[in-house]
Amino acid sequence: TIKKKEARHTEMKREMVAMIGGFHKGRELNQESYFGCDTGDDWTLHHGDCVEVAKRIEDDTIGFSVYSPPFSNLYIYSDSAYDMGNSANDDEFFAHYGYLAEQLYRITKPGRLTAIHCKDLPMYKGRDGAAGLKDFPGDIIRMYESKGWQFHSRVTIWKDPVIEMQRTKNHGLLYKQLCKDSAASRQGMADY
């Protein structure tokens, strides 16, 4: 009956609140527990907080690094206070990200490269004051240049707009929007 369903729902909510409320009890914020390292012939893979790991690496020892940074404050990646993606805004994010760029510059051999996966980020009228796109890749390039790096090149990774539309439900990708008002249409957002 409906009364039984309501009672089960209420009990389930109570249990969920109790379980979530106790989630952090007994957990220590121990940065050491996130560190790990694997090696093979001519390669080393580090796992851990990138800034903390980079601090442990000797100067001028890395030939090539590749990674995807947090996309500013677009997603919450973890509950860690150390996570640079847990930022209130772009300024705070780039202040934190700058520490990594400095460390990577220190540990990278002169003339060698780092490859960064990123993409343009959506702007929302409620949060950003206007709807559109932020040039996140350009912001990364400018920040890296301010830390001593030289921009080498950009590779565009094409994304299927139909798949993006199905995933994001963005009206700017719909054919009916093109017919209705093409000024509000856009192509799929590439990665870089």
Residues covered by each model-derived region:
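Core catalytic lobe of class I
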Residues: H24-Y192
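A conserved SF2-helicase RecA2
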Residues: T1-K25
